[in-house]
């Protein structure tokens, strides 16, 4: 009982579903200090994900002197930079590996009912884009910004069998696993 409640509270604090149908997730907030003649100046950075849960997702990184302003800036930027991703009934079309900097992500499709098995920043991206079943692993750096960028790069590089068949000028039936 207590575990369920703590799980609900954790999810509620990190995710908001806004009236326009967008899912907004706060991935990380960081305090940065700059030492000047008069002492230290503190600023805050925020990393956020915005998605519609149906294959569209974007991320934003905002900086400001106050946390709410940094979050607001990053949300606005995330909405401006949204990209579309092709999904296969709530999972991926094929296994994907992508890098950004020293962060490397590996994602593969999972059978229905598996859920999102991913950590941290990857989980936020996958849930916002609308993936329901996936197995994912972060290798190398766990820097949230690089993990988000690598995850998005992998999702954008993923192609449906129909798209590949059109590019090659072949029939989709020729792409089955048995042939």
Swiss-Prot record:
Subunit (UniProt): Part of the 30S ribosomal subunit. Contacts proteins S4 and S8.
Pfam families linked to this entry: Ribosomal_S5, Ribosomal_S5_C
Family to which this protein belongs: Belongs to the universal ribosomal protein uS5 family.
Organism: Xylella fastidiosa (strain 9a5c)
Domain notes: The N-terminal domain interacts with the head of the 30S subunit; the C-terminal domain interacts with the body and contacts protein S4. The interaction surface between S4 and S5 is involved in control of translational fidelity.
Positions of the S5 DRBM domain: 22-85
Keyword Ribosomal protein: yes
Keyword terms of this UniProt record: Ribonucleoprotein, Ribosomal protein, RNA-binding, rRNA-binding
Main function: With S4 and S12 plays an important role in translational accuracy.
GO molecular function ontology, one term from the record: structural constituent of ribosome
Protein name per Swiss-Prot or TrEMBL: Small ribosomal subunit protein uS5
InterPro entries with a match to the protein in the record: Ribosomal_Su5_D2-typ_SF, Ribosomal_uS5, Ribosomal_uS5_bac-type, Ribosomal_uS5_C, Ribosomal_uS5_N, Ribosomal_uS5_N_CS, Ribsml_uS5_D2-typ_fold_subgr
Top-level lineage group: Bacteria
One GO term of the biological process aspect: translation
GO cellular component, one term: small ribosomal subunit
């Amino acid at each position: 009982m207590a575990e369920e409640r703590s799980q609900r509270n954790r999810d509620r604090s990190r995710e908001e579903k806004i009236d326009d149908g967008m899912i907004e997730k706060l991935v990380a907030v960081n305090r940065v200090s700059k030492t000047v003649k008069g002492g230290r100046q503190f600023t805050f950075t925020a990393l956020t994900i915005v998605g519609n849960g149906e294959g569209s997702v974007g991320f934003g990184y905002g900086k400001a002197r106050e946390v709410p302003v940094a979050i607001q800036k990053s949300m606005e930027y995330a909405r401006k930079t949204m990209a579309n991703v092709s999904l296969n009934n709530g999972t991926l079309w094929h296994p994907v590996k992508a890098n950004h900097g020293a962060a490397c992500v590996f994602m593969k499709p999972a059978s229905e009912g598996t859920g999102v098995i991913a950590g941290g920043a990857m989980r936020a991206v996958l849930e916002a884009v609308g993936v329901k079943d996936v197995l994912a692993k972060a290798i190398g750096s766990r820097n949230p910004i690089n993990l988000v960028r690598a995850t998005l790069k992998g999702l954008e590089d993923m192609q449906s069998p129909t798209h590949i068949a059109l590019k090659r000028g072949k029939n989709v039936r020729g792409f089955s696993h048995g042939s």
